Amino acid sequence: MKILIYMDSEKYHHPPVMMGKIIAKATDGEINVLVVVPKGGHPENGEAVAEQVKLDLEGYSPKVFVKQGKSREIIKEELDREEYQLVIADTDRINRFKKSIEVDPMFIKQSAISLLLTQQTKPRINKILLCTGCKEDDYSLINQASALAGDLGAAVTLLHVFPGAVPSMYTGLEQIEETVDEMLQTDTPFAQYLRRGVEILKENNIASEVKIRRGIPIEEIVRETQVENYDLVVIGSSMVDKGLLEMLLGNLAVKIINRIELPVLVIGTRTLA
């Protein structure tokens, strides 16, 4: 896996570097680090961040680049130069990015590259919350998450949230949380998708469970992270409309970042390998 860690020169953020180490170690990945100095900024600050990165990534042989200019242009140039599978950035940086850069849908047209936004990063990833929209016949999200979980040695909870009221096909079930087994035995597209998802996880020797909720998706995702001790939340790029920049700025991703004090991985279409 080829990983790009995105840093800025204003302040050294350790979580992206820590997460880069965790994933690179598990996947035998290659790490590049891009330190961006804004126009009018001090290049020596960027060099100081770069030196700290090299110390923290000792043993991983990272390539560290310090560049000055507009963040958007520098990131695009680097992503055009190399075929990365994963970009890691800190949420503090994303919030500043959101305030300072107008969304340009043509900036990055595809949603191929996975994006990992770090906060409250733990030294190990043991438990992953995988949020699925149950897209019929599309198991790419589960396949990608399963492969990563296998490399990390992590367990996976597969969560699906029915927006609003419980679907009419399940009317009469008093507590949807308590009837997962019953729902999985039906022939509905949701049940078929989740059953296949569990099979994929089992095929990869991943310890797993399925949880089903009803309500506002973001609220149910937040609630789940509050009652269980997860280390990483995973969503699909289909939850965001346009490319990597939209992953950074898209409404759902921003809501999740703002509400969940955990690293969030948005999985793109390019294989994490």
Where in the sequence are the language-model features?
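Charged docking surfaces used in two-component/phosphorelay signaling
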Residues: 66-74, 213-219
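Short, hinge-like loop/turn segments at secondary-structure boundaries
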Residues: 49-51, 134, 174-177, 227-228, ...
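General small-molecule cofactor/ligand-binding pocket signal
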Residues: 32-34, 63-67, 116, 157-159, ...
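Small/aliphatic-rich secondary-structure junction motif
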Residues: 1-45, 58, 127-179, 200-202, ...
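A short, acidic, amphipathic alpha-helical segment used as a generic capping/interface helix at domain edges
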Residues: 193-198, 215-226
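A short acidic, glycine-rich active-site loop
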Residues: 178-189
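Short, surface-exposed alpha-helical segments at coil->helix boundaries
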Residues: 17, 43-51, 187, 191-195
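Gly/Ser-rich helix-loop-strand patches that form or flank binding pockets
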Residues: 76-124, 223-273
